[in-house]
Amino acid sequence: MARYLGPKLKLSRREGTDLFLKSGVRAIDTKCKIEQAPGQHGARKPRLSDYGVQLREKQKVRRTYGVLERQFRNYYKEAARLKGNTGENLLALLEGRLDNVVYRMGFGATRAESRQLVSHKAIMVNGRVVNIASYQVKANDVVCIREKAKKQSRVKAALELAEQREKPTWLEVDASKMEGTFKRQPERSDLSADINEHLIVELYSK
């Protein structure tokens, strides 16, 4: 599947917020002018219409999770079919992606690196190798690093970085074993308040 391979900081500047596409726990606004649009001089951002605001929010979330447009739309359709709040269902589906769970557990420094670990068959779910980044992890699934991948320096570095991040309450991780359990789907209160999923629902409801 095609992936965006351009500058990561450019995407964060376009959305006006840190999308956490680079490794590390320090906010990137100390390294680049995040409030400015991409480009050498950072052209002034125009005032957005309601549609523009909704579109930017969708792009921000889509890029945060590293999902392409068609797949993101399919996630929305699935979220709308499920019972409950469509916006919260959408976030739950994105959080349940295997590459995201690997990132949340601290096995990858970024979601992109976590996706690579999955595609390179370095990840096991319930004792079986899974190399599909979009695989939906379910409650009580056990995710771990394959034995032969445990010596990779990038995995060890990612775990060290994860120690500096807030630990998700819906996961249980044993860093020494490089293993974690997906205890439950995260609740809306567990996730970033910077995401306004209602804008995405409004966008796709038109």
UniProtKB/Swiss-Prot annotation:
Superkingdom field: Bacteria
GO molecular function: rRNA binding; structural constituent of ribosome
One annotated Gene Ontology cellular component of this protein: small ribosomal subunit
Family matches, as InterPro entries: Ribosomal_uS4 (IPR022801), Ribosomal_uS4_bac-type (IPR005709), Ribosomal_uS4_CS (IPR018079), Ribosomal_uS4_N (IPR001912), S4_RNA-bd (IPR002942), S4_RNA-bd_sf (IPR036986)
Domain S4 RNA-binding: 96-156
PROSITE patterns linked to this entry: RIBOSOMAL_S4, S4
Pfam families in the record: Ribosomal_S4 (PF00163), S4 (PF01479)
Keywords carried by this UniProt record: Ribonucleoprotein, Ribosomal protein, RNA-binding, rRNA-binding
Keyword flag rRNA-binding: yes
GO BP field: ribosomal small subunit biogenesis; translation
Function according to Swiss-Prot or TrEMBL: One of the primary rRNA binding proteins, it binds directly to 16S rRNA where it nucleates assembly of the body of the 30S subunit. With S5 and S12 plays an important role in translational accuracy.
Family designation: Belongs to the universal ribosomal protein uS4 family.
Subunit relationships: Part of the 30S ribosomal subunit. Contacts protein S5. The interaction surface between S4 and S5 is involved in control of translational fidelity.
Name of the featured protein: Small ribosomal subunit protein uS4
Organism field: Enterobacter sp. (strain 638)
